C-alpha cells in the first residue's frame, strides 16, 4: 500500500495534472522502459498521448491497438499474432507496448524519409508517408507529436535519465 501511495505521489509530481492514476502508472512504466533502451521518453510519451491519451484498451477504426496504437494487420500479423484480443492485451500492457513501439520506431529509422522530425510522420504513415493521400494529416500528426515532445522535454527534463 505504501509503495502504491508513493507511486501516486511521484506521479502527481512528475506527470501532467490531467493524467488519471492508470495513465500515470502506464506513463511511469513507459518512461522507465524507454530509458532502459536509451530511447527518448519525451518522444515516446508524446506518441502515447497523441495515439491513445496513454489509456490502455484502445482500438481504432483502422485496427490499431493499445497505448501506441500498433497496427494489427501489419505488425500484429508480422509478429505472429493470430488473436486480436491477445494483441490488444499485449499492446495495452506498457511493458509490451514500449517494446512494440521501439521495434516500429527502429524499423522507421532505417529510412531516409524518417530522419529527424519526420520520425513521427513515419511512425504514423510509414516510410512512404510523403506519397500518401493523407500526407497533410500525417504532417499535422507529426507536428503535434514533435511539439508535445518538446513541451514535455522542457517541463519534465528529469524523465530522461
Give names to the regions the model predicted.
Residues 9-161:
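Catalytic glycan-binding domains that act on GlcNAc-containing polysaccharides
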Amino acid at each position: 500500500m505504501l509503495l502504491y501511495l508513493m507511486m501516486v505521489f511521484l506521479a502527481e509530481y512528475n506527470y501532467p495534472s490531467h493524467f488519471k492514476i492508470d495513465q500515470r502508472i502506464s506513463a511511469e512504466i513507459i518512461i522507465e522502459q524507454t530509458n532502459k533502451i536509451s530511447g527518448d521518453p519525451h518522444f515516446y510519451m508524446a506518441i502515447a498521448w497523441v495515439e491513445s491519451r496513454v489509456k490502455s484498451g484502445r482500438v481504432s477504426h483502422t485496427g490499431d491497438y493499445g497505448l501506441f496504437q500498433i497496427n494489427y494487420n501489419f505488425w500484429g500479423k508480422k509478429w505472429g499474432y493470430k488473436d486480436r484480443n491477445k494483441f490488444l492485451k499485449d499492446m495495452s500492457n506498457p511493458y509490451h507496448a514500449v517494446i512494440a513501439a521501439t521495434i516500429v520506431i527502429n524499423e522507421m529509422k532505417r529510412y531516409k524519409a524518417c530522419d529527424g522530425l519526420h520520425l513521427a510522420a513515419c511512425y504514423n504513415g510509414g516510410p512512404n508517408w510523403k506519397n500518401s493521400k493523407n500526407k497533410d494529416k500525417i504532417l499535422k500528426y507529426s507536428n503535434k507529436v514533435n511539439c508535445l515532445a518538446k513541451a514535455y522535454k522542457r517541463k519534465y527534463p528529469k524523465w530522461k535519465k
